[in-house]
Amino acid sequence: MNTIFSRITPLGNGTLCVIRISGKNVKFLIQKIVKKNIKEKIATFSKLFLDKECVDYAMIIFFKKPNTFTGEDIIEFHIHNNETIVKKIINYLLLNKARFAKAGEFLERRYLNGKISLIECELINNKILYDNENMFQLTKNSEKKIFLCIIKNLKFKINSLIICIEIANFNFSFFFFNDFLFIKYTFKKLLKLLKILIDKITVINYLKKNFTIMILGRRNVGKSTLFNKICAQYDSIVTNIPGTTKNIISKKIKILSKKIKMMDTAGLKIRTKNLIEKIGIIKNINKIYQGNLILYMIDKFNIKNIFFNIPIDFIDKIKLNELIILVNKSDILGKEEGVFKIKNILIILISSKNGTFIKNLKCFINKIVDNKDFSKNNYSDVKILFNKFSFFYKEFSCNYDLVLSKLIDFQKNIFKLTGNFTNKKIINSCFRNFCIGK
């Protein structure tokens, strides 16, 4: 494999820049620009020479294979963060047949050299991208060991089953009833292991999912007031003039250690002469698909006219989301704040201005946000695997040729999870989600 390098510290002002190099020619690259003898795993302070000119003082660390991150020889240059110096060193590396690393290529080489599994790579990626306490707990080393233990057990049990069934195919007369019971029992254990794996992946995918809450409704019903109360800030302008909000205003907040995107929108109305207002309404309608929860606000307690005078395709789009109808200005209506249901639609009477019922509203939002089954398209590979295997277990028969072919397919799918059975496309799609320098 080619020698690769990357700047692993961010661009911009700073005191330090770190350049990481990995490959078989790293020792050769050092000798040309450093006059000192570089020892393994010892930080060496030395001058860097390019064209017999000292360009900088650097801290150099050399890691010898195979006990390195990538499984290859690695060198790290710790130099001053001066763009001229950095460019000189990068040009030197390019002239000596090294190349820029692709996103995630260091970790990809670690995987290709057999030092890590695909599941571990995914856990590392989640740890970097999603910064919350729950994700940290799920991706720490102890959890990683549980994942690997489950996969190891799955592989062992599948191999045992394949061996048993191949023996049965070879000489059925020596295959006893106890052997049949052993196969059924092993199938049952496999299902349990898959269920544990699915539960863990469900939580991880739930934490990865971006959750968006949109506040929709007609003009001057109190959407901006509610937005400010929930976010505990005053980013939306609040007046008694209809149509104050012309564009979508968004704010990120935290609920149950999960980041939520709150969106305040322009009032919905079909007929308007104001061009800016029309553009705002069209944007609202298009953004509905991006929302997970719709808080639809009205200010008159008249269920028949809830969706009066709004765009025709609005209702079709809103059906795809969770929906809570908020009847605002309960203090003016002379009604008590409260909650009730009509035809499985949750309706809450509130007063955004007083804000006394906002805590209760947050509780209902919490329940929807905390619903880990909310996203039905996550962890599809393992879920399909589980469903197929459940059906296979229920329909289990003595047609051992069929059983064996199904098991071998199942074994391949398990190997795809670990990376033992894969192809170039799968590897590329996995590692290109990482940052440069990882």
From Swiss-Prot:
Binding positions ((6S)-5-formyl-5,6,7,8-tetrahydrofolate): 20, 76, 115, 438
UniProt keyword terms in alphabetical order: Cytoplasm, GTP-binding, Hydrolase, Magnesium, Metal-binding, Nucleotide-binding, Potassium, tRNA processing
Residues where K(+) binds: 220, 239, 241, 244
Enzyme class (EC, first level): hydrolase
E.C. no: 3.6.-.-
Coiled coil region boundaries: none
Binding of GTP, residues: 220-225, 239-245, 264-267
Alphabetized PROSITE patterns for the sequence: G_TRME
Principal place of residence: cytoplasm
Function: Exhibits a very high intrinsic GTPase hydrolysis rate. Involved in the addition of a carboxymethylaminomethyl (cmnm) group at the wobble position (U34) of certain tRNAs, forming tRNA-cmnm(5)s(2)U34.
Protein name per UniProt: tRNA modification GTPase MnmE
Species the sequence originates in: Carsonella ruddii (strain PV)
